[in-house]
Amino acid sequence: MYPNQTTAAALPRRNALKVIAVCAMSPGLAGSLNAYAQASNPFEKTQSTQLFEQWRAMSRVGYGPTPQLVRALQTASSPKVWTVQQIDLAYAASQVAPLMASDLSSLNAPLPDIFDAAQRERQARAAIKAVTADSAGNTNTNELLNNRNNRRMDFSEPADPLYFNRSMVQKAAAWRLGACSQPNDENPLLARMTEFWFNHLNVYSGKGAVRPFIGHYVVNVARAHALGKFEDLLLASARHPAMLYYLDQFQSVADGSPAGQGRLRGLNENYARELMELHTLGVAGGYSQNDVHETARILTGWTVGPNEANGFRFAQRLHDTGRKVLMGQYYPDGSLNSGEREGEQAIRRLARHPKTAARISLRLAQFFVSDSPAPALVSALAQTFQNSQGDIRVVLRALLESNEFWHPENKLFKTPMDFACSALTTVSSTDKLADSTDRRRLILTENYLSEAGQPLHDWQTPDGYKFDAATWLVPEALTRRADFALAITRQVSDLDFLQPYLSATTRAAIAQEKPALRAGLALASPDFQYK
Amino acid sequence: MPSNILKPHPKAIDRRQALQTLLGVATACSAWAAPMAWAQSARPGQSEGRLVVVFLRGAYDGLSALVPHGDANYYALRPSIALAKPDGTAQTTLRLDNTFGLHPALAPLMPLWRQGVLTALPATGSPDPTRSHFDAQHQWEIGTPGKSGNAAGWMNTLAGSLAGTSADVRAISAQSIEGAENKPQAVGVGEANPQILAGSAAVQLVAKGQAATRQGAVGDERTRDAVMRLYSGQDEISKAFRAGADSRRQTAKTLSNAMSESTTSGMGSNDMNKDISREMQLANNGAGNAQGLLLDAQHLNTLMRQDRRLRLGFLSAGGWDTHANQGNALGALANNLGNLANTLVQLRREFSQTNDVVVVASEFGRTSAENGTRGTDHGHGNTMWIMGNRVNGGRVHGGWTGLGIGNLHENRDLPIHNDFRSVFAQLLRSTQGLSNANIDKLFPGFAWDKSLDSMLRT
């Protein structure tokens, strides 16, 4: 799907360490816990501990192994060293535009162009509606619009103006699935952090106005700030059309603003509430209904700017210039005139709040370590977050160097997204041509995610997806993983590089079956469901 | 990573326990570990009641569904989104009495109202003041206002308590999962794992939409054998997988058979299929949000009809968080309400035996006044709907003090005149024969609300 390029991530520094040969008869990881516990000298870890730590690094810092990643881990001085190295590599990668197949690149087009095309689609649809309104005034647009097949991820032709939004949603999905499954093209930790932040600052592709901006938001908000300062990320999301539309902020104005025809417009609390409840402080963060109202007043006039490069405009004339009190502080403060700056100050203040540090730290620990991370780890991360003014790189270093991250008892069950991306990663790594991701596989993957209850960019509410086993380890849903594993490995003969990471029991069960089934069974195995 | 060293996390224990019980693992810390015959059929000789809860996530706007057209404040508070007073023409409120009426999109419910099997309670909810969707939903689903920690869902607890009380003990099929006593009493369609069904009792969770009808890989014997060998262990995930394969095959067969029967017999299915294909179209366009609810309800109907052991059903739909441009007689909310009405009519077809009850509720209500963007923000009290033969329907129940500013909660929202737990307490005592002590296990600290005693027929 991308030009075949080797990135820094694929070229680990050779640390003059001997390559550890992986023995095909290894006992798998079943014994690794004991081995780990008995490793009195950390420099003499047993082979199964090595394998265990390699798996953990590849599956949590990225989306699972490829032969190339396995080699990188084997040649690194330790899985921990490789893991920590990814932080700076991911940061460097986040500072440049992502690799993108040319037929997907319009998802990252300049925002004014996206606004224009979305406008053209609205006009085209309105024209159809006008034609097909029946005598009762009901329109049958849906039947008309559905008279064609839009389910193929084929973007070789320019999008029909009528289907611009849909094509943008699909391109965003295609790029995301490519990025999470091609560690040569996208640093795996960056793909992980993009997932984490998109989910934390969720927007929903089912909301009409949001749809054409989904991919742009993923790339320029979640990815671009994935390892930067949290407050910059938060402000970028606050000003992005996808978020402005999703939580209705774009139309929240000072109460009593004129709206034409003698009507008045006013406040909408939606974004203000979720900014505090979900993006920053958390529901028990000590704010009141009145604080929600005051934040909404502070942010009046923050709206979309279809002609602006960043898609954002501050409409001073729709701004509430009165004095507000948010959590005990006045906005604007004495030195300011009332305007855009007070909103920026309020958002930065929320971003730096200790409750925010605690909330982000807990969610990161749940994403990387365990469903119920040790409180001591979370508070240490929160302290790091505050000491570094919300520098995500510094927090990640503390997290990935922690004993908890490496502890065998801190298990994580893969979410459908983890499972889909890791299956896609292993399968794509067997392709002879590394520069083309098979779009049929992407469609399969997208469909699996929808069926599993974790459709890509398509969670309706601003809380984002849960990551815990309690949500996803459900009997019937487990069997759907097997469907996907078998479907996506139809043309894949073997995944031998996975073997050392599977338990002896699993390997024996797979060996009994005919070769055509083996790759699918490896991905469907219980071992592959954990990261 | 290898499954034999798995240990459930303490926090995840409630939902994980569900699996363990399903798999015949004793759960020492569960009050319901041993099923007790603590509920008797409410009326001997009558069919055992079945309870279906339809949960509207996102806080639906009850004041648009059950319209207080007789209250002048309603029109003052909502200059652009109020439903017009009833005048008998299309697009106006459908009059129920001098105070209330139905949204025109709810017209399909009018016959049920007139038959007296449908009622609404206009100002119900949880006493906890939170305006967070996610906290409010969590508290509603665990049956404990104000509690934020992990706990079992109250429908799961109820399912566990009903286990063993069923008079119908079905022969166990060869493929049956380990332990007939662990057969689910509750089924949820559509959501991955809703909190309300999470806990130590076995429940059946069925995929949303058409996916529920497909057996997938486990439908093919060779593949199934191969996959089952991978999951032949005694660890948690293996047991869960085996139970899932079994349940999924059964579900898909049941639904497919029902589908082919209805298409060959033509039992009202043409209209239904037309409805559903339209739903699907809407879904494909990202238009409606209660889209898919109709199909999920149809699946729920079929599954609960075929397996009489299933006494509890759960459905949900999102898309009710109407902060902007919610419309009135037409618009996004009207479309959703239309979907909801069709769903309820569909559920009525199945759940019309003596003690069957269908309940519609949401986590909280919305502001009484419209906001500055022709929508509504997060509120407090809301309308709950109850449908069933035992319902003293065709009239509104519960408290109502109008929309005068002095009568609003925090001068902005509907108050709570009736706790949602009191409403369920009435239903559970009358249709499931639960004692107050047992209801208190589902809703710790609930209080009996005598003002609702007339809500059901004895």
Q: Regions from the language model: what does each represent?
A:
Chain A
Residues M1-L11, V22-A30, Y36-A39:
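N-terminal secretory signal peptides
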Residues A191-M193, E231-D232, V394-V395, L517-R518:
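Alpha-helical scaffolds flanking conserved acidic
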Residues R211-H225, K229-A398, S402-V427:
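Active-site substrate-binding loop specific to GH73 endo-beta-N-acetylglucosaminidase modules
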Residues P42, T46, Q50-V96, R239-P241, ...:
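Cell-wall polysaccharide-cleaving catalytic domain and substrate-binding groove, primarily
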Residues N41-Q50, W55-L69, H353-S388, R393-K531:
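Flexible, low-complexity segments enriched for small/polar residues
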Residues N41-F43, A173-P183, Y217-N220, K229-F230, ...:
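Short alpha-helical segments and helix-capping/turn motifs at coil-helix boundaries
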Residues Q68-Y91, G215-A226, L381-N387, A508-A511:
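Amphipathic alpha-helical segments that form the core helices of the histone-fold
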